[in-house]
């Protein structure tokens, strides 16, 4: 693992364009595609109560047409070259992206910038997409695991914006006006908040020219504006340790997430927490998978995950099981977390976790879309790029003692839990959940 298996120092280039748009590219020889994304440093945490779900609503709406293109025209242009066009919204950012052949990168640049900067937002389209978003909320409500994720965030982060679902609520979407959406778009989708990331068979200077030409017609955010720095923590600690949330659901399984809040992404060294997470529940050999599924057969699916935002994050365990076995699952998970908090992980567990992270990182570099995502997130979150070689070295440097220290710090905290399943009230849940 000593060779540079990913980003070479001279293949990632960065430019800042007039208006404050940041452009980061990575040349990947030997491929015939380019993945290109326009990242906006705006997500659901930036919404007011009235705007809840606006960032995600806009993600749908911007594809409905611009002054130069109809919705059908947008789809036809991309289909005609066999490309992919899509978008996603998260708590702290939104990304509009395309994946095309290298010969069609000019089309991808023009189309994406047109969609992001010159959308129509017609009243009829707002009403049409309102119904689509409401259907998406219904789909979320019919998927216990998706519903659980939102419930856990709400239970852990409470009234902080991190606790709100990205998709919004049925009430907020039904009441959201075209004026609210237009104001959010005009006020937040400014060029200093934009990052253009591209990876594949490309030339940086050509992408600079294409993006600059496409942005020349934009009517806002030009001039001497400078790019915005990475999102800073607000100083608010959005934590409700020991809370328990329940969403009754007539499902055959009980679905549970339990975990703890972590500090924001600028506090803990990311590789240490990532190693801890991988060893706890990141794979088939992980401590939780072995204890819950392999040795006791209590659940088909069990894993841990970690997310990091500017203000805070979480380290959480998910499991789905028969309702009558929920108490036993919770007891085993709590025992595992308690053991790791006190005794740490074995050297072998740490070594396997580090190997898993190394392999996942390098394998992800074989995909131009993954590389583009890495570029965009790094620029938005940190304002800099870190080579894969550097990332591999940081993973390799993690020691069992460092992992043990973070495990003791985090896993000694009171657990927060959320449950989706066939229970009507909190007092129907197992005692092992009610004494967190």
Regions found by a protein language model. Give the residues of each.
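Histidine-centered active-site/metal-ligand motif
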Residues: 56, 60, 204, 255
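A conserved active-site cap/scaffold subdomain adjacent to cofactor or substrate pockets
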Residues: 265, 272-282, 288
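M16/MPP (pitrilysin/insulinase) zinc-metallopeptidase core fold and M16-derived inactive scaffolds
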Residues: 30, 35-99, 282-298, 309
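N- or domain-start disorder-to-order transition segments that initiate the globular core
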Residues: 1-33
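Charge-rich, well-structured scaffold segments of protease-associated domains
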Residues: 10, 16, 27, 71-227, ...
